């Protein structure tokens, strides 16, 4: 997998994300692609849901919930860097206005815009087989006027 080919796949992924084409995003991923949104946690009464698992189960559910709660969700890609091993690093801002509850964050019509760092791996078949994302979850909560004390 050449660096330019891997970067092209990930660029298409973000284009589909911007278009809220969740099925299209998952179509760019292998059937067993790993998914890890490191800062993501939803605390419930009996368990904690974390953003770790597979794209087809955990990732797709998170992305679907996100675009539902933030109907104008968008991303601005600032840089995409890849290598011939299929590794691709993306710096992007994710932004949107909350209209529906997101986890335990009540909708107040607030907007957020937060820098994100993503690390992808694209396999030899041209499919994404790993997605990892990092961001400041507290920064998003502040922007959405959600102040939670543990």
Regions found by a protein language model. Name each.
Residues 1-150:
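C-terminal and inter-domain tail/linker signature
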């Amino acid at each position: 997998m050449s660096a330019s080919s891997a970067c092209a796949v990930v660029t298409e992924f973000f284009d589909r994300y911007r278009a809220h084409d969740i099925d299209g995003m998952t179509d760019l991923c292998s059937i067993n692609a790993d998914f890890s949104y490191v800062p993501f946690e939803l605390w419930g009464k009996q368990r904690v849901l974390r953003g770790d698992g597979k794209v087809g189960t955990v990732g797709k559910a998170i992305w679907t919930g996100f675009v539902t709660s933030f109907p104008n969700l968008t991303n601005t890609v600032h840089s995409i860097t890849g290598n011939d091993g299929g590794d691709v690093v993306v710096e992007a801002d994710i932004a949107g206005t909350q209209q529906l509850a997101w986890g335990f964050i009540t909708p107040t019509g607030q907007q957020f815009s937060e820098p994100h760092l993503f690390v992808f791996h694209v396999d030899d078949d041209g499919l994404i087989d790993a997605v990892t994302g990092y961001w400041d979850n507290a920064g998003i909560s502040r922007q959405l006027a959600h102040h939670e004390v543990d």
